[in-house]
Amino acid sequence: ENLAVKLHPEKVEQISEVVISGVTRKKYKNKKENPAYAIMQEVWKRRKTNGLANYNDYQFKEYEKIEIGLNNIDSAFMKKKIFSNLEFIFDYADSANFDKKLALPVFFNETIYKTYGKNHPEKKENRIIVANKFSGFNDNELIASTAKNQFKEVNIYDNTLNFFNIGFPSPAGTDGFNTYEYELTDSVSVDGIEAFVIKYFPRNKEILAFQGNLLISKDTYNIVKAALRSTNKINVNFVNGIYLENEYENLDDNIFLPKRTYTELEMSVLGKKKDAKSILFKRTGIFSEYEFNKNFSENFLADKGQTLSDDNLKKADDFWERQRTEPLSETEQNVYKMVGELEQVPKFKRIVKLVEILESGYINAWNSIDFGDIYSVYGNNEVEGDRIRAGARTYFSPNDMWRIAGYTAYGFKDQKLKYGLEGRYMFN
């Protein structure tokens, strides 16, 4: 049979060679005969600590990209009635993900952070939002916050890596050989560093574990790059798959710093069949501009009370061109372009408005007055019987310093009219 190899056009220049390997596994009488075991022993002897813990204080820049897409779409999905007059959006679908399933990006978010931390006399850290950019919808903060909460930083040298509050054995942990088979498959050069390529896979396919490869420096036995993919047997509610790729900058033989991390999470409430529709979360985090022992002011450690929708975080396009640590791919640029086109379609505007109403529970009546909560219009209880309620509130923005709300309600069983009025003011 013919073998087709697909390459993403934006990444081809980064590829020095392509290695195609089968599933043949070399058998060893014992692990000491396995050359990968000797290499992993050196890794364990020289286990690294995150370099941030080795300084009195530290600061660094983080550039983060988050994308959400409808995954595993097909022609039948594209022909659904809801997409009439919106067919052009499928021109933006692509398969730029690990499993190469066709996905339609629907949300994109960029954030730049500046993190300040101190280790002495006690551990303190503050992550300040410098700039934030949404893909164009009216209210993205809830979507972005939900997406960001799905991702957690992991230390590859830990024995256990936590995802969704579930522990997965780390392939670089000291007890890795209890869970994984290791195989030395190749040697490569990564940014001028000669590295071993060690492939790993779980001994037991039924357990929660990863498969992938580790790139390990031949000189210092640092992990230069790690790729982790959950097995097909992953048994976590609503989670179809996890893929993680981490790159590290090693300052010396004892410490490392995170350099780049890329994560994909595929989630679905519709089941785990191969053709099931799912939501694909993708996150890229790039860390740079590390500085240490600068003795910065304690003010940098004070909580700023920021939200992603703060007006002062909105920056012009030329700011983003200068400050992006990594340029946007064609797919990422197209999310902004697609949303711009969608916002010109009346049907889409109505869909967005409906989603906003369902999300907030309020209907904008005029100017800054909302009616709601719509979920409280009707109720039933022992005292009032059937109950109807009408309410309203002021709403200028998600960050209102003050807000007034009121309601009136009537119970048909007790035949009593109720009402209430409240005012809120945020002092800080």
For the regions a language model picked out, list residue spans one by one:
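Periplasmic N-terminal soluble interaction domains immediately after the signal peptide in Gram-negative
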Residues: 1-32, 243, 263-269, 275-276
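Transmembrane beta-strands of outer-membrane beta-barrel proteins
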Residues: 258, 402-406, 428
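Outer-membrane beta-barrel channels and translocator barrels
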Residues: 251-253, 397-399, 428
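Structured extracytoplasmic
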Residues: 24-195, 201-209, 270-379
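Outer-membrane beta-barrel translocator/channel fold
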Residues: 238-240, 265-279, 424-428
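Extended lipid/amphipathic-ligand handling interfaces
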Residues: 212-214, 218, 243-253
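Membrane-embedded beta-strand positions in outer-membrane beta-barrel channels/transporters
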Residues: 4, 40, 245, 389-391, ...
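Transmembrane beta-strand segments that form the barrel wall of outer-membrane beta-barrel proteins
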Residues: 200, 227-232, 369-380, 390-391, ...
